[in-house]
C-alpha cells in the first residue's frame, strides 16, 4: 500500500508523536509519506514532505500545494489527523483520526472511516464507520529503560488550558515532595507565577519538553494527569508500560484504563483529594495497577495497534477493487 498521512500543528506533542510512530511502523512494510510543517521534519523517521499546513485553512496556496502533492504521490490511502486537515482533504479512500473529543465532528463524518482515541471521541460517529484505537507504546523508545530510585512525582504534557496544569499546582503541598512538570505552552509563565505565589518554588520545578520520556519515568513515584479533556493520552500508556502508576482526572478513556480508585472527578476538589490520598502510598498504588501494567505490555504496543489500522485499510481497498 502507498499511504499518505497529513497533519497540521504548532507543537510536537501527543498527536504528532502518534502520527510519527504510526507512519514509521507502517513504513516497515508499506510505502509511507507524511505531509506536515517544516519544523517537524527532523522528528519523523518516515519519508516527510514539508508543507506549511499551519496556514489559514482557506488559503488558496495551501489548497494548491496539497492538491499538487497528492497528485504526485497518488496514494492508495489518505489518512488525516485532526479537524483541519480532515476538513480540507478530499480523497477516494479517506481515513481520519479524532485524537481528542470534539463538539463538531462534521468534517470527520465525510471521511470513509474514522478512528477515535476513545469511546467519547466517537459518540457522534456511526458505529459502522468507526472504531476505537487506543494509543500505544513504541517499545523501541524504552529499550534502555531502567527503573531507578524515585525522586519526584511527574507531569508530562503541554502547558495549555485543556491540560489544566494549574489544577495540579493548586492541589500540591510542600509536604508531598518534589513535583517535576515537563512541557511547554502558552501557560508556562502563568504557571511559574502561580508556583511562586503559593510558595512552592522549592517543591515544584518546570522543565522543557524532551523526547526521552523514559528517563523521566525512570525516577518517578507516579505520573499525574490533571486534564479537563483528553483522548487516549500516550504518556498514560508509556507510564504504565514502565510500571509507573498513574493518578488522573476522569477524561477521555482514562476511566476505561485505570482503576476507579486512581481516578478523580473532573473538578479541583476531587482531584486534590485524590492526590492527598495517594501521594504517600505509591507502593500500594502500584499494587492495584498491576493488571494495568500487564494489559499495556500485552495489548497496547505500537506493532499491535498499527496492524489494526492496516487491516482496516486493506478491507476498504478490497471493497474498492471489486
Where are these regions (language model features)?
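Conserved acidic donor-binding segment of nucleotide-sugar-dependent glycosyltransferases
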Residues: 260-269, 276-283
Amino acid at each position: 500500500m502507498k499511504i499518505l498521512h497529513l497533519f497540521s500543528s504548532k507543537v510536537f506533542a501527543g498527536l504528532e508523536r502518534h502520527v510519527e510512530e504510526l507512519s514509521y511502523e507502517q513504513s516497515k512494510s508499506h510505502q509511507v509519506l507524511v505531509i506536515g510543517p517544516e519544523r517537524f521534519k527532523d522528528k519523523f523517521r518516515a519519508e516527510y514532505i514539508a508543507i506549511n499546513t499551519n496556514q489559514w485553512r482557506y488559503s488558496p496556496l495551501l489548497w494548491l500545494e496539497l492538491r499538487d502533492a497528492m497528485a504526485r504521490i497518488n496514494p492508495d490511502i489518505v489518512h488525516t489527523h485532526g479537524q483541519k486537515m480532515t476538513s480540507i482533504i478530499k480523497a477516494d479512500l479517506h481515513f481520519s483520526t479524532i485524537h481528542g473529543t470534539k463538539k463538531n465532528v462534521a468534517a470527520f463524518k465525510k471521511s470513509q472511516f474514522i478512528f477515535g482515541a476513545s469511546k467519547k471521541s466517537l459518540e457522534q460517529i456511526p458505529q459502522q464507520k468507526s472504531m476505537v484505537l487506543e494509543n500505544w507504546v513504541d517499545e523501541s523508545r524504552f529499550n534502555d529503560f531502567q527503573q531507578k530510585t524515585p525522586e519526584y512525582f511527574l507531569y508530562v504534557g503541554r502547558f495549555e488550558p485543556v491540560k489544566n496544569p494549574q489544577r495540579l499546582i493548586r492541589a500540591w503541598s510542600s509536604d508531598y515532595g518534589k513535583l517535576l512538570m515537563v512541557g511547554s505552552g502558552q501557560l508556562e509563565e502563568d504557571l511559574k507565577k502561580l508556583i511562586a505565589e503559593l510558595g512552592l518554588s522549592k517543591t515544584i520545578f518546570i522543565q522543557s519538553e524532551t523526547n526521552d520520556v523514559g528517563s523521566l519515568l525512570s525516577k518517578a513515584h507516579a505520573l499525574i494527569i490533571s486534564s479537563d479533556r483528553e483522548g487516549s493520552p500516550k504518556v498514560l500508556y508509556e507510564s504504565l508500560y514502565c510500571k509507573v502508576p498513574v493518578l488522573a482526572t476522569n477524561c477521555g478513556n482514562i476511566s476505561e484504563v485505570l482503576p476507579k480508585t486512581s481516578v478523580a472527578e473532573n473538578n479541583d476538589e476531587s482531584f486534590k483529594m485524590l492526590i492527598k490520598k495517594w501521594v504517600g502510598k505509591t507502593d500500594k498504588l502500584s499494587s492495584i495497577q498491576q493488571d494495568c501494567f500487564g494489559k499495556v505490555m500485552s495489548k497496547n504496543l505500537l506493532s499491535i495497534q498499527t496492524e489494526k489500522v492496516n487491516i482496516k485499510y486493506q478491507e476498504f481497498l478490497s471493497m474498492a477493487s471489486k
